[in-house]
């Protein structure tokens, strides 16, 4: 009864679609006639469809309905249901497991040499097609391999700094207001020397914490102070 109810429900929905889009169908209920025992044995509904009046999406839904039989369904690819998919996976897995148990049986099989020769022919044909098409392949440069040899370096002539001969020279520089004297020791073979002179102050006078090298600063300041005081006294 459940199957009949589902079939009737689907048929009602289908009829609504037909009235809406003008599909051409024929329905028969001969499959639901009571048998000799008086029991209503559920059976599928049979539809005769117009192949050009239904969209592919609706045909796909009707094809996989277990309570519908489409007598003249258009020739379309049929999808595999879940049970068929499970059976196929189990069968393929069992075959793979059987082959992996003893790989030598594959090589010794009489079909193996035939398959191998076919694969070789396919590879040769593909190579000939590439050569015939004059395809240019850029050759990848081969990596260069360098050989390295460990060489032990030994220094046979080591000179200590204490043994190097030295000479002492005194440099004296005289400037108008500075005098410096620097003594330095030069090692044999030295071409550059940094000189840090010792500066001796000359003619430097300290006034109020500031240094000035002029010896006539005090008289000048005295004269300026006297003139500034005289200006303050005479200015009204």
UniProtKB/Swiss-Prot annotation:
According to the UniProt record, which cysteines are disulfide-bonded? none
Membrane topology, as annotated, equals: Lipid-anchor; GPI-anchor
- Major localization listed first in the record, in broad terms: other
Q: Does the keyword Membrane apply?
A: yes
Q: Which UniProt keywords apply?
A: Cell wall, Glycoprotein, GPI-anchor, Lipoprotein, Membrane, Secreted, Signal
- Induction entry: Expression increases during sporulation.
Free-text description of this protein's post-translational modifications in UniProt: The GPI-anchor is attached to the protein in the endoplasmic reticulum and serves to target the protein to the cell surface. There, the glucosamine-inositol phospholipid moiety is cleaved off and the GPI-modified mannoprotein is covalently attached via its lipidless GPI glycan remnant to the 1,6-beta-glucan of the outer cell wall layer. N-glycosylated.
Q: Where is the lipid attached (GPI-anchor amidated asparagine)?
A: 212
Protein name (record)? Sorulation-regulated protein 2
Endpoints of the signal sequence: 1-20
Residues modified by glycosylation: 155, 160, 203, 212
Pro-piece positions: 213-236
Q: Where in the cell is it found?
A: Spore wall; Secreted, Cell wall; Membrane
GO cellular component, alphabetical, reads: extracellular region; fungal-type cell wall; fungal-type vacuole; side of membrane; spore wall
Q: Which residues form a coiled coil?
A: none
Tell me the organism's taxonomic lineage: Eukaryota, Fungi, Dikarya, Ascomycota, Saccharomycotina
Superkingdom:
Eukaryota
């Amino acid at each position: 009864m459940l199957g009949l109810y589902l079939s009737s429900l689907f048929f009602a929905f289908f009829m609504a679609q037909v009235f809406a889009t003008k599909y051409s169908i024929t329905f028969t209920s001969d499959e639901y006639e009571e048998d000799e025992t008086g029991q209503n044995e559920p059976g599928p509904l049979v539809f005769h469809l117009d192949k050009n009046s239904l969209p592919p999406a609706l045909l796909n839904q009707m094809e996989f309905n277990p309570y519908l039989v489409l007598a003249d369904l258009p020739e379309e690819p049929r999808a595999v249901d879940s049970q068929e998919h499970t059976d196929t996976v189990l069968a393929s897995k069992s075959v793979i497991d059987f082959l992996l148990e003893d790989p030598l049986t594959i090589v010794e099989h009489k079909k193996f040499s035939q398959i191998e020769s076919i694969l070789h022919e396919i590879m040769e044909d593909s190579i000939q097609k590439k050569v015939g098409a004059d395809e240019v392949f850029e050759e990848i440069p081969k990596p260069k391999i360098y050989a390295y040899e460990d060489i032990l370096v030994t220094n046979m002539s080591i000179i200590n700094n204490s043994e190097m001969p030295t000479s002492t020279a005194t440099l004296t520089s005289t400037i108008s207001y500075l005098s410096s004297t620097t003594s330095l020791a030069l090692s044999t073979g030295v071409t550059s020397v940094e000189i840090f002179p010792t500066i001796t102050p000359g003619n430097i006078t300290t006034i109020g914490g500031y240094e000035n090298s002029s010896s006539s600063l005090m008289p000048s300041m005295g004269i300026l102070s006297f003139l500034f005081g005289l200006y303050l006294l005479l200015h009204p």
